[in-house]
Amino acid sequence: MPWQHRDLMNQRMEFALRALETENFRALCREYGISPRVGYKWRDRLLEEGMWRLSEKSRRPKTTPGALSEEEVCRIVALRVRHQHWGARKLQEIYRRAHGEAPSESSFKRVMERAGLVEKRRRRKASQGGKIGDDRRAGTPNEVWSIDFKGWWHDAQGRCEPLTVRDEWSRYLLEVRALENARMETVRTCFERLFERYGLPQAIRSDNGVPFSSSRALLGLSKLSAWWVALGIDLLRGRPAHPQDNGGHERMHKDIAREVEGTPYMDRQAALDVWKKEFNEERPHEAIGMKMPSEVYSPSARKWQGTPDQLDYEGLMSRRVKGTGYICFESQQIFLSTALHGWNVGLKPLDDGSLEVYFAKLLLGHLHPETASFTPLLQNSPQELEEAA
């Protein structure tokens, strides 16, 4: 006798009344298609509470320990409205810091969904992650700085294309600057200020665009990146047309697009400065244990001492690169790169009569005196002079 074919309330009353008289309780339960446990429950409820209590009881608990108060819900909604593009985990950390304890991450998600404060994202197809030429990843502050220009947009002040510089390990945003242009001199002045304030990094990660690189030059060196090499900074570059090689930096640019570019403001640099302060001092990051970048970043121990007049190649011959990109060796003019104009390079003789050509720690290639030619190194990999000696 399936339960669903008859009125549930009448069926329970009928069963309970018959259960008071039957001698074979289990057979009666089989007749009604229920377990003895359910049968005893309905019989006992009739005896203890009367026939009217045989109706279905709510399965909802009388108390819900995890239920949020109205005040907690309002706090969560206020946080989400203030930080419209932050996820539940970041908002939970901000809440905990402000109030000592915080509801669960799932509670944050539930409140935001019910308040209509969650935008559904289109699922992206998984992409094949690629390795860059030098796959070094930072393990301490200032081990690697990542840099790029945020894609431009137009505002009331004209074209805006901010330069962004970030410490890769701590996520600390060192600079987001709306420069007048992207010329080498302008960007170099900006980096001189950064080096003076934060010291020098061990390496700088960039894409292959101007002014960070020059696709047609020796090892992709531009005047700007040659200056970095002269300061003892290694160059890390992503593959052409592979922005995922600097993925963390690109994600930060998307945040700028949503939270600055897409909002009204009177002064672009003031708006960028406010966003930078929030990013560093208010926004927790999962990769650093939900801490703020300002809590884990510290300036570099390598202090900025200005640009050297010339580079020291102890024990090696040295030649200065002319404005045309040539060096003079044994009365022969040999072309290297105009990006090295004004710098001196080191020459180390080899047993076969050729010479290794170094720029700071970077092996550029081989000079062949007999043919007055130069063969550049195919891979841009820094090599210590002492290892080559």
Please state what every model-predicted region is.
Residues 51-144, 222, 292-302:
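Basic, flexible linker segments flanking DNA-binding modules
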Residues 224-305, 346, 350-351:
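Charged alpha-helix within mobile-element recombinases
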Residues 276, 280-389:
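C-terminal, beta-rich DNA-binding module of retroviral/retroelements integrases
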Residues 15, 28-29, 39-42, 50, ...:
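Mobile genetic element proteins and their domesticated derivatives, centered on retroelements
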Residues 6-23, 73-82:
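Short, amphipathic alpha-helical "recognition" segments used to contact nucleic acids or chromatin
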Residues 67, 71, 101-102, 106, ...:
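Mobile-element integrase/transposase regions
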Residues 195-218, 239-241, 246, 292-293:
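Acidic/histidine-rich, metal-coordinating catalytic segments
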Residues 1-14, 62-70:
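Short, Lys/Arg-enriched anionic-surface-contact patches
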